[in-house]
């Protein structure tokens, strides 16, 4: 999830001022036009993260990210005015950069579903490694041969955004399935069997039968 989720926004954020200058804005204008998306990005980050805690549906609300970005990336890729209509191009890119940012949600899921300190450290590090790998990938999507329209690169971004649907939905279904299976086994036990399990089990952290995954 961390590998692919942020590639479209990372690419556009990296090339924002370059793209704005290439479509007719001055350097000063490009720097000023980059400010609004930072403000909206912060507001949406807090809003989405708060909502997931309130609704207790983290992966469900995380679907807002591809639902939001896929149509905009489709416009960026297939609209004939992309890179020609400067204000239209700027508006689309800014809206994409203001997408619901799910990084905080993913980190919290790694932490909560790890349960033990040892596992939490490993899972969080692995997640961050995948995020960094995504940054490396994003730096190689826009190529000189694809400039100045970046049709091929924008097509890749569109495909990656689409791929987030099965990733998020699949993750949700897996966690729900595991929790249901554990509920069946746990509820089938008598109180004595539960007490015996809790006092004798060698299972730790998220492997425990009485642990339920957050999703």
Curated annotation (Swiss-Prot):
SUPFAM superfamilies: MFS general substrate transporter (SSF103473). Its main location: membrane. GO terms for cellular component: endoplasmic reticulum; membrane. The chain crosses the membrane at residues 3-23, 30-50, 59-79, 87-107, 122-142, 156-176. GO terms for biological process: transmembrane transport. It is found in: Membrane. It is a multi-pass membrane protein. Keywords: Membrane, Transmembrane, Transmembrane helix, Transport. This is Putative uncharacterized transporter YOL162W. It comes from Saccharomyces cerevisiae (strain ATCC 204508 / S288c).
